[in-house]
């Protein structure tokens, strides 16, 4: 079935979503990371990046917030770029754990691999794999350059967030050294954890994340900069991982109700990929008990359902002026 949607319709629906949910008071800021606890809880932004490079923005789409776990997608892409899909599967894996994002039990249950680069254990392993192994500065430069390629503009380290996370990341320290015990980390554990903590502390905007999502939706071609960031055949690999674990143990419910693969972070950001159509991101600091932004979820679901879009419905969708 063919379906046409106008850019005006997308703008209208995005504005409706913003107006509908901007006063929602459900959820609360992440309180286990001091910096995040103090962010203005009323911030709310939506951005959609079309594959022609046009962005549709509503609300606080240019506010720079902590990227947190959404960064796992970016570093997974970097590992895919440097090693290829086969080696990522062998060294990390692509299975959903069905457990919370910071689970230590998942490592004990599947000690032969960390399961997926989109949970903490796999993301720390991914940071350990980033080349050149053994050189923290060059690894960090590669991580930032990759995010810049995907987003079309550079992120900025939020130093206060980095210090806040570094002082409270006891669980992740346990994960890093447990991975070492099972020979599933490929560089110094403390260095790898520090890189992971730093990448989670990068400041990003909803607009930047929508461009990154559109780059994935556009088979690795950044629609804004026109740069081929990664090989087209890697796009289904990363999208499939987002589909299965983007919302951790609640991914099934999310995909069932929204129809779009998306990755979430406790900083309040959600980044969704609709292959061949657009990237969408929403941001609002209050999160639910699973660590997912309440308003960002509601907004993206509204846009998808109101426009009748779903990654599984088989429609041939054309977006027109």
From Swiss-Prot:
Residues the record lists as binding substrate: 69, 120, 165, 172, 196, 248, 266
Record keywords: Hydrolase
Molecular function as annotated in GO: glutaminase activity
Superkingdom of origin: Bacteria
Alphabetical list of InterPro entries matching this protein: Beta-lactam/transpept-like, Glutaminase
UniProt EC number: 3.5.1.2
EC primary class: hydrolase
Signal peptide start-end: none
Reaction equations catalysed: L-glutamine + H2O = L-glutamate + NH4(+)
Listed GO biological process terms: glutamate biosynthetic process; glutamine catabolic process
Disulfide bonds: none
HAMAP family for the chain: Glutaminase
Family: Belongs to the glutaminase family.
NCBIfam families referenced in this protein's UniProt entry, alphabetically: Gln_ase, PRK12356.1
Quaternary structure and partners: Homotetramer.
Protein name: Glutaminase
Organism listed in the record: Parabacteroides distasonis (strain ATCC 8503 / DSM 20701 / CIP 104284 / JCM 5825 / NCTC 11152)
